[in-house]
């Protein structure tokens, strides 16, 4: 069965589509969304959990080396990795919040996949993290269906990373592909997330419309200018409908981080000075909340930073405030800080002022945040989001008739107002902010399922009709497969299957073969 799989920075979801009607499956406590969070007793427990309890293969040498190191570490530390050692979603968050020092916790693994400078062992670790989440989600989906899930269309941003370009995209998509294969998906395709979101919106249109899809996810913002309408709905080749697109690595997480830095970190000593009147360095406070930046988090939780923070406590005019930051370092509270800012951001969607409590750092430590403060705090990432809108429009010669705003941050009045100000004459439409990408991926998966029954072989096209219903298309080319065509007394030995990923186009499967008889 083919599913649409939104492996998101903030949340994950999956859907199936039947006769053009997508249905999202539940993943956690009856909810359609599984927050992109994972925890385990140790970092090494992830690899052992995959191997010991799910027999997930490690086909490459780096993955095998990671597994051997993990098994050795857990054995030496007397850590018993059980079937329930690895937790996901809100359960993972709850475990972390109860005892952050004793739990290895990661939020939004997807935000790291395109990072530059990752070493092979780091790539192998992220692959295991993604694989564990995908395996769990696949199992949750199969528990609601009467057949196995082995095929998926997975959403991807236009650009995973602000820097690195094609190389970063290739690295990130490679991690997703290998993780999905190891998690049991034998057949995997990718589709741009804003295109998928647009497919869901298209189902509501009754005439051809120029649509600017603005998808503000947890880790990225993607914009696509598309032609949409009834005449495009069932077309296999839609390359002509993609008029322009752009994307960058700025999303809801960046808004949360900036809000935490601007409104919460002053309670922890940001902006203070030493007893001699010298300004305290801001970098440790920034690194503490930069949870989507591997080098920043590594630097903050280093022994050298711990020594620096103790020195700052000693020298600061207000040592009690700086001691709060030292506690964040000691108890690994970065995610809780950013989570508090995220809760404030969400609350400010419906009210002008909200209160953020940092009682997990010190009793009575709290602050009020207003909508005006939110707008000021997120000004920098907001400008980058609007820049992507203008870049997408600059790549085409026409203007949109409607803006389709979606993604987890689409509900923010600040974002909506800024977008409306940038394009004052264009109406803004909304749909399912958290489910539109998944629903669109499921729609595309249903189309692919039909397309995969058509194969181009050396210029001859064999279509899946009553005469050729026995065609079995497999994408695994590790061994040579024998394919039988019912209406011809021929057997073909497949030498190679070649495909090309197209942003919004026809699935082309070209087979090199020799005739056996």
Where are these regions (language model features)?
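Early-domain small/polar-rich strand-loop-helix modules and first-structured segments
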Residues: 1-118, 251-281, 286-289
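Nucleotide/phosphate-binding catalytic cleft detector across ATP-hydrolyzing
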Residues: 1-22, 96-213, 234, 321-340, ...
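A short acidic Gly-Thr/Ser loop motif
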Residues: 5-11, 157, 213-222, 226, ...
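Phosphate-binding glycine-rich/basic clefts of nucleotide- and phosphate-handling proteins
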Residues: 35-40, 47, 228-360
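Extended, hydrophobic alpha-helical segments in both membrane/secreted and soluble proteins
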Residues: 176, 209-224, 405-408, 415, ...
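Conserved phosphate-binding/catalytic loops in two-lobed NTP-binding clefts
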Residues: 183-191, 417-443
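N-terminal amphipathic/hydrophobic targeting modules at extreme N-termini
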Residues: 453-464, 474, 478, 496-499
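Cationic, low-complexity basic patches in intrinsically disordered or flexible, solvent-exposed regions
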Residues: 481, 501-503, 507
